[in-house]
UniProtKB/Swiss-Prot annotation:
Known cofactor(s): FMN
Intrachain S-S bonds: none
Protein name (Swiss-Prot/TrEMBL): Pyridoxine/pyridoxamine 5'-phosphate oxidase
SUPFAM superfamilies named in the record: FMN-binding split barrel
Residues at which substrate binds: 54, 111, 115, 119, 179-181
Example GO biological process: pyridoxine biosynthetic process
Length: 200
């Protein structure tokens, strides 16, 4: 990373993330908000899957899921997660690690109300991560929920809401020629952040 970059890029990781995310939304052809969420179970087995970022501010990074899913079970067991954004068009990655907490019921309700009605119905129809005997069974449950909520609003299911990852470490990675990549690490320190570079 050049001295010019060090002095012109934001020194607050949340500001830097907003800057990079804005560039990704302008250049990434598919789902710039897609991120990998890594968790680990009580048995030590790691697990990873893609979700969509639905909120970001100084408190952390928010995504939504079924609280009875495998990912939610592991998050509630350990209270920690790692996130990864990979924007191929920019040849950049952002890695985030930290503790996890549930969003407030009010936040969950507000976000659920913005979802397309079909997605709201789907949240009621799916027993996420549980065995399914056939696609027909799932589709029948969906039709059942359509009838149940016909003509009225669809409330947020009690088992469906969000998690917030409060970052303790945020690393920004930029591809460079000759594998001389740039790695800029922010580590939470009290109410602020310490910053440094890493060898690639």
């Amino acid at each position: 990373m050049s001295e010019a970059q060090l002095t012109t890029e934001p020194t607050d990781p949340h500001s830097l993330f907003r800057s990079w995310f804005a560039e990704a939304k302008a250049s990434e052809p598919n789902d710039p908000e897609a991120m990998a969420v890594a968790t680990v179970g009580a048995d030590g087995q790691p697990s990873v899957r893609m979700v969509l970022l639905k909120g970001h501010d100084a408190r952390g990074f928010v995504f939504y899921t079924n609280y009875e899913s495998r990912k939610a079970t592991q998050l509630l067991e350990t209270g920690r997660a790692a996130l990864l954004f990979h924007w191929k068009s920019l040849r950049r990655q952002v890695r985030i690690e930290g503790p996890v907490s549930k969003v407030s019921p009010e936040e969950g309700d507000a976000y659920f109300a913005t979802r397309h009605r079909d997605s709201q119905i789907g949240a009621w129809a799916s027993d996420q991560s549980r065995p399914l005997d056939s696609r027909a069974t799932f589709e029948a449950r969906y039709e059942e929920m359509l009838r149940r909520f016909e003509g009225g609003p669809v409330p947020r299911p009690p088992h469906w809401s969000g998690f917030r990852v409060a970052p303790e470490r945020i690393e920004f990675w930029q591809d460079r020629a000759h594998r001389l990549h740039e790695r800029r690490l922010f580590t939470r320190s009290g109410d602020g952040w310490s910053e440094g570079l890493l060898y690639p």
